[in-house]
Amino acid sequence: MSEFEVNDFGEVVSNAEEMSGAELYADFLGKVEKPKDEFVYYYSKYLSVVNRLTGAATKLHFWLSLNSEVNTGRVFVQSMTQRGALDELKMTVGTYYKALNQLKELGLIKGESAVYYINPAYIWKGTADMRARFLKVYPRL
């Protein structure tokens, strides 16, 4: 059974218990210590895309990544959350949707309406071992 499944609502969920980064990277790096905290990782591939983003799209992408679920990259943007984001990012509704469309067009996020997924090839919030497992199961997210 995979550590990730798609539930009845089309959401990617993790059913993994304890994960060990050392299992995945032992052949390549030797012993790898698991970080004590969760991090938001920005991968070098992201640099090739970030220069093409507008300032609003960059701010929105950072906001979405920081507010995404750990180890899934899923972000819920309900109307209350959207209003909070607009206030926090100092954006108009029109600017928000233009930025959102640019993120989708460049493949940085996927999703519709209130549920989006951060593309783990660029940014990942969580542990590196869960990202590796996620990319193995969903290589084209």
Model-derived segments and spans:
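Intrinsically disordered, low-complexity segments enriched in small/polar residues
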Residues: E23, F39-Y41, G94, A114-V115, ...
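N-terminal start-of-chain detector that recognizes signal peptides
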Residues: G30-P35, L47-V49, Q82, D87-M91, ...
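Acidic/histidine-enriched, beta-strand-rich ligand/metal-binding domains
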Residues: T54-G55, L86, K104, M130-F134
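Short, amphipathic alpha-helical interaction segments positioned at domain boundaries
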Residues: W124-L141
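Short recognition helix of helix-turn-helix/winged-helix DNA-binding domains
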Residues: M1-V77
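Winged helix-turn-helix DNA-binding recognition segment
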Residues: N51, N67-W124
